[in-house]
Amino acid sequence: MRKFLIFAFAAVMLAACNKPNEKMNNDLITRIAEIEVNDGYLEEYLAAAHNVGTKSVESEPGVICIFPMQVKDAPNTIRILEIYRNEEAYQTHLQTPHFLEYKQGTLHMVKSLQLVATEPLAPEAMPLIFKKY
């Protein structure tokens, strides 16, 4: 009887682990923005990046994450993790007043910008990491 219970428990756990996450979204857009800030504009740029990231996540349902980070050994290098629910959410984000203000207000501060498309390796962890997912 004990072996049967262990087997039954293992079967239930295996089924639970293999159950697809109903919230899993194959339409996610994930990328890392790599930004080099011109000398003399770092503090101003950091404030603008913080502001647009916070406003976007707070006010846009399709924005899961905008997380600016500064490279420790290269302070003028900024990386921003961006996650959008889908293409429509991304396009909507590009038209918001807070994004347009950020974009226009920082054009002269940015030396270079590269958007690197990424593919999540553990999408099942998204609900554990991001409250909005």
Where are these regions (language model features)?
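Glycine-rich beta-strand-turn "strand-cap" elements at beta-sheet edges
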Residues: 18-30, 67-74, 103-133
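An amphipathic, aromatic/His-enriched active-site/gating alpha helix that lines ligand/cofactor pockets
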Residues: 55-65, 83-118
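Short, well-ordered beta-strand segments in beta-rich or mixed alpha/beta enzyme
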Residues: 28-36, 65-94, 132
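Sec-dependent N-terminal signal peptides
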Residues: 4-12
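Short amphipathic alpha-helical segments
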Residues: 41-63
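C-terminal motif of bacterial Sec signal peptides marking the signal peptidase cleavage site
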Residues: 14-16
